[in-house]
Regions:
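Acidic, mature catalytic/reactive cores of soluble proteins
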Residues: 1-397
């Protein structure tokens, strides 16, 4: 049921309905595309497979969501109406059923080609940080580009396991997908060509798909995904690393003027935690870089009194070309509060890469803050974030 909310253009319905497998396009009929949404389902699916060994789930079938939104939320399908239902159909009028693997590929291949002028994935209406919502035209999320790179490698590994353990040699994929997975690697450097490839794919399935499928060797797909992953990681390493004495970190975003958000500015150092988390988790960050990131995070983001690692340093600017978060007072909400979810992912990433002491520090500081009732003022548990005074906020989340 959970993959039934994915559109064939790689975007997804954003609201879960009242029944299993029921989805609603968006809240209040406001079309928004969060560029990170395609990344999370694979994490959950891979976790399930790790826990159960059930690789066969990748071959199970699910429909695709269909509504008026097409071409990744940038146009409307004039040939669609609600009487046609909410499932994608083919040229024969049949509901399209694709494997879970195919759904995941659709999400990741479309994301790979939707890039901005620095060849990172476009931020669109936001990513995990909902408050980065004012850079739709030129914004890019380097942070989640790294996250997708890690996923592409994970998916390649799952495909290899599917071949080795279940002896599956081929998979059937939508014929329309072929130009995306088959593209020559030289195109990866060509921003205009990538954008054109994505646009052609989206237009080929804007109202319906042909219904044709092609069998593809698993090894070919796995090799392509591995190469895509490696290309992204190398690109980020070469273009987004910020040097700072014996420490450093990765730039996480580009704003709506296509400018790098982090680094050394007249107003001070600008650093965000999100880009470091996914660079580490995805293995984009190499071991020595992780050591330098930890030093920088301790120097610029760590505040024990606030509960640990803040989401960002104080930019001393209301950046209306990036998001509403800069309209909040520093230390509140997304503007520099200690966000429990991102801190936990920072710890998770560090543990995954063998930096156990550093990961423990992040988690333990969260625990100490939450357990200190005189300051946190919450019942036992973890709040959404700790504000500038160290108080736990939105505990019910």
């Amino acid at each position: 049921d959970n993959y039934g909310g994915v559109r064939v253009d790689g975007t997804n319905a954003t609201i879960i309905g009242t029944k299993p497998g029921e989805f609603i396009a968006d809240r209040n009929h406001i079309t928004r595309v969060w560029m990170d949404h395609g990344m999370w389902p694979l994490l959950t699916t891979a976790f399930y497979i790790d826990q159960t060994g059930d690789l066969s789930i990748l071959l199970e079938k699910a429909p695709y969501f269909k509504d008026a939104q097409i071409i990744r939320g940038t146009a409307k399908d004039a040939n669609w109406n609600e009487t046609q239902g909410c499932w994608q159909r083919d040229a024969q009028g049949d509901i399209v059923q694709g494997s879970i693997l195919e759904h995941i590929l659709v999400q990741h291949l479309t994301a790979f080609y939707e890039v901005g002028e620095h060849n990172h994935m476009r931020l669109r209406d936001a990513d995990w940080n909902d408050a980065l919502d004012m850079a739709n035209e030129c914004g890019e999320s380097v942070a989640f580009t790294a996250a997708y790179a890690g996923n592409l490698r994970t998916l390649a590994e799952l495909l290899a396991a599917l071949e080795q353990r279940m002896h599956v040699q081929e998979v059937e994929l939508l014929a329309e997908l072929e130009p995306l997975w088959k593209q020559a690697s030289a195109v990866y450097e060509n921003i205009a060509a990538k954008q054109m490839s994505l646009n052609e794919y989206c237009r080929s399935c804007s109202h319906q798909v042909s219904g044709r499928r092609k069998k593809v060797a698993i090894k070919i797909i796995a090799d392509k995904l591995t190469h895509m992953s490696e290309w992204i990681m190398n690109h980020i390493r070469e273009t987004e690393w910020i040097e700072d004495k014996n420490q450093g970190w990765f730039n996480s975003y580009y704003d709506n003027h296509a400018r790098a958000v982090e680094g050394h500015f007249d107003s001070g150092v600008r650093m965000m935690l999100t880009g470091q988390v996914f660079a580490i988790m995805s293995s984009t960050a190499q071991e020595e870089q992780i050591r330098q990131i930890v030093k920088a995070a301790d120097a610029y983001l760590y505040d024990a009194k606030a509960g640990g690692y803040r989401l960002n340093t104080d930019f001393h600017e209301r950046k209306d070309d990036l998001g509403r978060m800069f309209g909040f007072a520093y230390g509140h909400k997304e503007n520099g509060a200690v966000f429990s979810h991102m801190t936990t992912m920072y710890a998770n990433a560090l543990y995954q890469r063998g930096f156990a002491r550093e990961g423990y520090k992040a988690l333990h500081t969260l625990y100490e803050q939450a357990a200190n009732f005189e300051v946190s003022r919450i019942y036992p548990g973890i709040p959404e974030y700790f504000n500038d005074r160290g108080r736990g906020m939105y505990h019910y989340l």
